[in-house]
Amino acid sequence: MSRIEKMSILGVRSFGIEDKDKQIITFFSPLTILVGPNGAGKTTIIECLKYICTGDFPPGTKGNTFVHDPKVAQETDVRAQIRLQFRDVNGELIAVQRSMVCTQKSKKTEFKTLEGVITRTKHGEKVSLSSKCAEIDREMISSLGVSKAVLNNVIFCHQEDSNWPLSEGKALKQKFDEIFSATRYIKALETLRQVRQTQGQKVKEYQMELKYLKQYKEKACEIRDQITSKEAQLTSSKEIVKSYENELDPLKNRLKEIEHNLSKIMKLDNEIKALDSRKKQMEKDNSELEEKMEKVFQGTDEQLNDLYHNHQRTVREKERKLVDCHRELEKLNKESRLLNQEKSELLVEQGRLQLQADRHQEHIRARDSLIQSLATQLELDGFERGPFSERQIKNFHKLVRERQEGEAKTANQLMNDFAEKETLKQKQIDEIRDKKTGLGRIIELKSEILSKKQNELKNVKYELQQLEGSSDRILELDQELIKAERELSKAEKNSNVETLKMEVISLQNEKADLDRTLRKLDQEMEQLNHHTTTRTQMEMLTKDKADKDEQIRKIKSRHSDELTSLLGYFPNKKQLEDWLHSKSKEINQTRDRLAKLNKELASSEQNKNHINNELKRKEEQLSSYEDKLFDVCGSQDFESDLDRLKEEIEKSSKQRAMLAGATAVYSQFITQLTDENQSCCPVCQRVFQTEAELQEVISDLQSKLRLAPDKLKSTESELKKKEKRRDEMLGLVPMRQSIIDLKEKEIPELRNKLQNVNRDIQRLKNDIEEQETLLGTIMPEEESAKVCLTDVTIMERFQMELKDVERKIAQQAAKLQGIDLDRTVQQVNQEKQEKQHKLDTVSSKIELNRKLIQDQQEQIQHLKSTTNELKSEKLQISTNLQRRQQLEEQTVELSTEVQSLYREIKDAKEQVSPLETTLEKFQQEKEELINKKNTSNKIAQDKLNDIKEKVKNIHGYMKDIENYIQDGKDDYKKQKETELNKVIAQLSECEKHKEKINEDMRLMRQDIDTQKIQERWLQDNLTLRKRNEELKEVEEERKQHLKEMGQMQVLQMKSEHQKLEENIDNIKRNHNLALGRQKGYEEEIIHFKKELREPQFRDAEEKYREMMIVMRTTELVNKDLDIYYKTLDQAIMKFHSMKMEEINKIIRDLWRSTYRGQDIEYIEIRSDADENVSASDKRRNYNYRVVMLKGDTALDMRGRCSAGQKVLASLIIRLALAETFCLNCGIIALDEPTTNLDRENIESLAHALVEIIKSRSQQRNFQLLVITHDEDFVELLGRSEYVEKFYRIKKNIDQCSEIVKCSVSSLGFNVH
């Protein structure tokens, strides 16, 4: 059991904050009494115990009022510390420390808990561990061996909460639930109930899922069977396709070879036709070209080429000169651009220089204006009007410098005067301050000495106070030492360690027997569980057999009518497959016919599309040709338009020739008419009658001569256009022939073919519709039979599985034969629990005996330690008594020194006050002097700075003016203006030269145009001769193609080609049908495999088996949970009733031995089950109340009892709860237990407490703490042999709580 040994308190409530104020209390066993007046700090000790154990603050405080008030201590920070030394449930020594700090802020106090420390002593070594508050709380509850609720409400119950057993119902229920730990067990039951409900729901879900998994498993088996069948059919189909492909390859190769040869023949035929057309066109072109030419050159080709090349050289020479002129013109243009660029740059530079000149004049005006302004400000004569010469400006600068120096000198003199006055004033201030500082140091020094002397005096008085009771304490120590030695001897004599050890050995043997029995029960449980699995499997198999019988019946009833209508009877799988095979063969034949018709229809549709496309292409081609012809001709009458254009070209050629010779003729006529000897017309030889008539003819000829070159140029241009149009129309001659062929032959033939193909398509569609109708009748029968085949296959598989299940049922039945199953799992489990309970009881007894052995050994060790501590304390007190006389003399001496220091400090403070007044006056005078100095200095500096700024601006303008003159900007400006005029003159000369070159180029172009007419005639001759050569080559090539074509056997190739196409079509038709079947099989296999890969069919059998196992296991788990729930519920009820019975028994005994009234026989706690809980809610709740009984009548005490009865009842209930629940912790604290009790009940309470102590005196760990102000009550307790010392709580001269240990005998002396 755990027990507390020592506790120290510092800085808590009224306990002091200095180290010397730390109070230490050692707790006695079995009784510790704390006595003191109200407000002395008794309850604080209980609050400290509760805080150190649970971390909870007293009611009504959050911690800041729990710590010593900083305002009272006159400190900013106050630290509080509580240390407790105790032994845990294992007897190990533990020390716990909790610290707090309270900081005084401006308006409120701030509280903070510091990190706690736990120190354990193991093997003679101390191990410390810093922990957070929550961790310390858990560690304390674990070490003390009781719950936090018991610590708060039973062991260390605060005085304000001491009457909680008679509080209102809800609060009372909460307290009792926490003490009984009922909340945890109720939550455990609720969790079990919820888990059981969840598991039951899961079983239903598993059953539903199992139903679907079974269907998926059966469907997956059916799909696998179908895949196997289709894969066999696919293999056969692939072999047929392969044979067709082997036949087809050599025929395709031969057909390709023949088609290549036919293509070659077709190409030769097309080339011959093209050459014929080309030859005809070339002959026609040559004839037209000869007609267009005025005459044909009769010389050799060499002569024609020489003449043409010489003419070209002449033209090229003239063109070269034209290029040279153009190059010269480009050069002049480039030179003009450069001059224009230079002109622009010079204009920009001229503008920039003009701007600088304007700015220069502006700077001169600004400088003169600033000089006039500053001269006026400084009252300088001779500077009233500008502009100013250089000599005037130098004189101005000299005068300004003199004025600046004078102003600066005046300002410096004024500052020096002020500095002397300030130094004098500071000297006076320093003298006063030195005197004041000296007095301050004296006061501070004397105060420090005073403080030290006061502390020394306080410590000496404290030591004397501690030594006051030392003489009595030595006598007490002698008595305590004799008693301790007597108790040690008695404990060693009464020790029964050996007997307890023998009892432990006996209990260990009994425990070993129980362990063996439990192992046997475990083996029996395992065997029963194994047979339970066998029975479960038997049930599953029987259920599976019934399911399969039902499935077979359903399949037969579902398809019986349908199969009978198709076959005339209900077939088995093989019979149905044979019928399906014959029906499938019929369907395939129909499909083959349908595929052949579809292929023919597709071929006809393709042929129709081809004819439509060809017809559309021919019509578009015709439309395009007609549009092109119309764009060139302007009408559709191509031949007449071409003849008319040729006539116009001929006329234009003649006109061109006439105009070409007109210039020479008109010139000759004019020469003849102007000749004085010639006065008649050169053409008609008519004589002119008058000179005016002659001049009129000359003028007309001259006019025509001037217009002739332009008319020639216009005529040549028109002629070129017409020739170009003629060439274009000649190029369209083949297109015109194509238009005629398209209209008269090709398009009508294609339209006839299209009508024939449409008739074939309609016939094929009728045949296809007939076959599809037949197929639509057969296929539903096949599909219906296939659906039935699936279920028939499943039915046969069910029949096979049914045989297997019947075999397994027989095997499981054989396993269960000869097995005795009278004992169930529940019976064995019940017996196992009983044995386990006995084993736990024996283990607890062993542990208790070991604990008693350990307690007796520790008690003897503790008594030895107590004896040694008393001897050591006696020696220490004897030593301290020898210093008493010395301390009294020291007290008198220190008191005298303190009084003297008080007087000296007071005198010094009286001298400081007049010095402070004088110092303040001198400082104010100095401040005024500094302000005047700063003001005067600012005025002088502002004036000087203004002059400097204006002089600086004048210098800036002067610098800019000098830089302009030194850089020669004015001369540079004039130079740039001269350069600009020169560039403008050069630009004008360049433009004149360009005009002359343009005129020369115009004359050259006219001459070259005249030469081009002769060049065209020579070119036409060369073209004609070249075309004649090409015509000969075309004739030769045509003859060669005819010869090559005659060597090929065209008719035999076409016949063979037709036969090959027919053979290939037949094979392809069969091949396509085979491929269609193959593709159908592949698609069905892929479909089945894809379906098998779907989540519901993948691993369907494994999922079904696993789900069956999970469902059965969950059902067994749910049964176990139900058993455990009921067992736990019964255990909770049994524990609750047993504890309540035990508590009420103790309460009755204590009440009867304590209460002296006759109105109440005894009291007890009633716990009633909650009657308002619904039937569906199986959670158990208890409502608690305290009742008082008189005879057979029970009344609620709450609201009916007196204040004294209420206190006594609460106290007795706490004592009963402590005795019941504090098995590992024998501590209980009673704070003012005599409140509201009369003398008779106080005496009976003291008697009852003594009896409790007596009954628990064998437990060395039992500790009762009693806090009271009633010294009579203490004296009553002191009459027992268990109380020799008690603690008196009082306040010292500093109003801090102190704990003083006193003897009970002295209390009795004082009382009486």
Swiss-Prot record:
Residues where Phosphoserine is found: S635
InterPro entries found in the cross-reference section: P-loop_NTPase, Rad50/SbcC_AAA, Rad50_eukaryotes, Zn_hook_RAD50
Keywords: Acetylation, ATP-binding, Cell cycle, Chromosome, Coiled coil, DNA damage, DNA repair, Host-virus interaction, Hydrolase, Magnesium, Meiosis, Metal-binding, Nucleotide-binding, Nucleus, Phosphoprotein, Telomere, Zinc
E.C. number(s) listed in UniProt: 3.6.-.-
Start and end residues of each Zinc-hook domain: 635-734
Cofactor(s) needed for function: Zn(2+)
GO cellular component terms listed in the entry, alphabetical order: BRCA1-C complex; chromosomal region; chromosome, telomeric region; condensed nuclear chromosome; membrane; Mre11 complex; nucleoplasm; nucleus
Cofactor note: Binds 1 zinc ion per homodimer.
UniProt GO molecular function: ATP binding; ATP hydrolysis activity; DNA binding; double-stranded telomeric DNA binding; G-quadruplex DNA binding; identical protein binding; metal ion binding; protein serine/threonine kinase activator activity
Record's comment on post-translational modification: Phosphorylation at Ser-635 by ATM in response to DNA damage is required for double-strand break (DSB) repair.
Tissue specificity remark: Expressed at very low level in most tissues, except in testis where it is expressed at higher level. Expressed in fibroblasts.
Subcellular location: Nucleus; Chromosome, Telomere; Chromosome
Residues carrying N6-acetyllysine: K959
Function: Component of the MRN complex, which plays a central role in double-strand break (DSB) repair, DNA recombination, maintenance of telomere integrity and meiosis. The MRN complex is involved in the repair of DNA double-strand breaks (DSBs) via homologous recombination (HR), an error-free mechanism which primarily occurs during S and G2 phases. The complex (1) mediates the end resection of damaged DNA, which generates proper single-stranded DNA, a key initial steps in HR, and is (2) required for the recruitment of other repair factors and efficient activation of ATM and ATR upon DNA damage.
Protein name (database record): DNA repair protein RAD50
Species annotation: Homo sapiens (Human)
Source species taxonomy: Eukaryota, Metazoa, Chordata, Craniata, Vertebrata
